[in-house]
Every structure is written in structure tokens, then in C-alpha cells.
Amino acid sequence: MSKVVVCAMYKFVTLAEFEKLQSPLQKVMETSGVKGSLLLAQEGINGTVAGSQSAIDNLLAWLATQPGLDNIVYKLSFDDVMPFYRTKVKLKKEIVTMGVEGIDPKKVVGTYVKPKDWNQLISDPEVLLVDTRNDYEVQIGTFKDALDPKTKTFREFPDYVKQNLDPAKHKKVAMFCTGGIRCEKSTAYLKEQGFDEVFHLEGGILKYLEEVKLEESLWQGECFVFDNRVAVDHNLEKGQYAQCNACRMPITADEMALDSFVQGVSCLHCIDNISEKQRQRFIERERQVQLSKLRGEAHIGSDVSQVIQTRRAKKDRLKKAQHDKSA
């Protein structure tokens, strides 16, 4: 089994004083050796973190002691290397940004469907299957016959619904996303818009891949994830995609062989949209990345304080050596 445990979690719960959780949560993550990002808002908690099994267990145990944060929904997957550089706890207005006031999954939400029952539901010809994720996620994998809203961000999803879905015409709507959190809001939104029978995949794609055998699966392709793995396969192991550091789009090995791909600077998805000023900035950033690698440091998204400490330690050792030599 891989050494690094990746834990995606969320819970919609009213956290009246969520700001006060930021500092102690950051401290618990750092002392446990957990990296990744967690978002806190009045509506709850969301994020993905990684560490050893004991580190993740410690974090989940601590969260369970906090009012309202017991029974957090989480999914585990594994990686051979740490997929995050930093430890961050951020304060937000929403833990998943739809931008529609009054949508509260704690009050109204669609019907949860277990992974084992999902195939039967989406095989029903009367069910409209909608992928709630962004276009760059859908392009590398989705469920058979699912509709692609072609949204750039989740904020665009309500407009897609208004323009393309009709409660009178679409009697049964099933939706899915990576870990389940976006569907909490998307199904709540549809219910508010008058849709009656609204379903969503409990635990999201990740839970489906974990519980449904490959030979029985209706999933096609890989699943995009928001960490350095870029995507995972049906075994929840790192997939075949890399990521363009300029536009963050997933890219294949064949796409990296094209003239449009320059490491850290451009790929076929963004080369025509990058200004000369941006290109020069990306070139300089990539140069710094390569220099950092030569020094044994991380650069993009790295823990800056750790890098500074490493450099200071090197300087201190050099000064001491020079002092000892002159003494």
C-alpha cells in the first residue's frame, strides 16, 4: 500500500464562529504532519489533505471533538508521494462557491444514491444524467451518456440550469461530482427551482470508484483531482495526466510532445491566450523552479518558511565553518 493517505472531506454545518477554528486547526495539521488545504466558512468545512495514516487519523479525531464537526464525510485514496506542498486553512464566504444566496443543503437537498445503486438509476432512460463539474474535469473522464454543461467554474452552473433544464420536461435528474460537495448545492438549487425528483451520487465519483468493481463500472476515463496527482484511475491511483503550470489544465504525454508545450510556460490549451508579458513571467518562474530543484527545494506552492529556514541553516553552517577555519 502507498505510504501517503489522501483525505477529501466536507460537511455542511453552521459554524457561527468559524474564524476561531482557523488557528487551532492549522496548528493540529502542522504538528500532525498533514499538508493540503481546508476551507472554513459559516456554512461548514471542505478540503483535501494528505499525510501518513496516523496523521490523518489524528486530524479526523481532533475535528470530531469540535462542535458540529463530528461525522464529517470523507474519502481516502493513496499516493506514493505527498501531493501537496503546503498546509493551509482558509476562511471563505462559501466552502464551495456557487454564488447563489439562500442555497442551504442542510434544509433541502436531493436524494442520495449509494454507489452500488447508481448504475441502475442512470441506466433508466427517463433519468437525465448531468455532470456538475467544470469542462476541464469532464474532458478526461465522466459517466456514460452524461451531459456536459461546459462550465468554466461552478458559478456558471445555475445559468446552465436556467437555460437548459425544465422542471416540466425533466422529471428525473441525477447529478454527480468528484466528492459529493458540489452536488449538495446543485441538487439543493434544483429543488429550489421546482424540480421534483433530483438525485445525486453519495460520496461522489471517488466513492463510486472505491466501491464499484471495474468490470461493473459505467465510469469512462480518469477522475480529475485538485492536487499534484492531477487525476486518479479506477483504482484511485495516480493517473496518466500531467498539468500545465501556466493554465493548470490537464495534459497527456502526447500533448506534451507538441510544439505548443513549453514546460511551465504554455500548452495547446493556453498558448493562444497568453500575452508576451505573461510568457516572460512564466519563463522566469520556470527558471526559478529549476534553480530550486538544483538546490533541493520546492518552488511552486512550497512552504516558504521551510525554504527560508533551510537557506538560513546553510548560511549558518557556512559562517561557522569559516569561523572555525580562521580561529
Curated annotation (Swiss-Prot):
The active site is at residue 177. GO terms for biological process: tRNA modification. Pfam families: Rhodanese, UPF0176_N. InterPro entries: Rhodanese-like_dom (IPR001763), Rhodanese-like_dom_sf (IPR036873), TrhO (IPR020936), TRHO_N (IPR040503). Its EC number is 1.14.-.-. Keywords: Oxidoreductase, tRNA processing. Residues 123-217 form the Rhodanese domain. It catalyses: uridine(34) in tRNA + AH2 + O2 = 5-hydroxyuridine(34) in tRNA + A + H2O. The keyword tRNA processing applies. One of its GO terms (molecular function) is oxidoreductase activity, acting on paired donors, with incorporation or reduction of molecular oxygen. Gene3D superfamilies: 3.30.70.100, Rhodanese-like domain. Catalyzes oxygen-dependent 5-hydroxyuridine (ho5U) modification at position 34 in tRNAs. NCBIfam families: PRK00142.1-4. Belongs to the TrhO family. PANTHER family: RHODANESE-LIKE DOMAIN-CONTAINING PROTEIN 7-RELATED, THIOSULFATE SULFURTRANSFERASE/RHODANESE-LIKE DOMAIN-CONTAINING PROTEIN 2. This is tRNA uridine(34) hydroxylase.
